[in-house]
Amino acid sequence: RQRQMCIRDRLQPSQVRDSQLCTTLELGDRRLSTVEHLLAALAGCGLTHVHLEVDGGEVPLLDGSAQGWVEAIAEVGITPAGTPAASRPVLEGPVTLHRGNSVITATPAEQFTLVGMIDFPQAAIGRQQWTVALTPERFVAEIAPARTFGFREQVEQLRAAGLIQGGALDNALVCDGDHWVNPPLRFPDEPVRHKLLDLIGDLALVGFPRAQVLVYRGSHGLHTDLAAALADRSAVQL
């Protein structure tokens, strides 16, 4: 029987323990994986004070997007918090980080704006770019429904290793070269939108900065590197 995990303390980038395929946090003596879509939904909808209880060590993936969490939030509603939200990071100047041929840059700006760029050899994806000045309304309508995506060869490898049992097509878009195995897409540029969904969830660990964040070939590792840099008081004003 799995224990229930209660999360009452403020989350922070220093709790990240793994960011290879998803974002995994260390919470006391336990770890919680695949937190990014839930955190994106909470932060994207404007929630600042939330008490979470989780059974097991993984947040449910649902359909691979944040849509289910957004719908659940809308069902219960949002009420004003009794205490003020934490201050948002204010950059002193540009912050640029690299991982291999991937790069993320945060530049001071009045409004939190995201620019995502991806470039894949698979023709079904190719090069995509999308920009959004983030508001709760735009998050709900234009970002939350975007699903995670993967590639047919990855699914076959995972099945051969006995790691998944036929559920991949229910919680991810699967690309096979020049086509999608399980269409239709919710947006023509759904992959790059999902990359920004992941970025929002990872930056929720520190709070949305007053900045424009541009990311090329983003990953959870790169995103959480930026979150850690934003949490460094020598780089930003809090």
What are these regions (language model features)?
Residues R1-Q4, R8-H49, E53-L238:
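C-terminal regulatory domains involved in ligand/effector binding and gene-expression control
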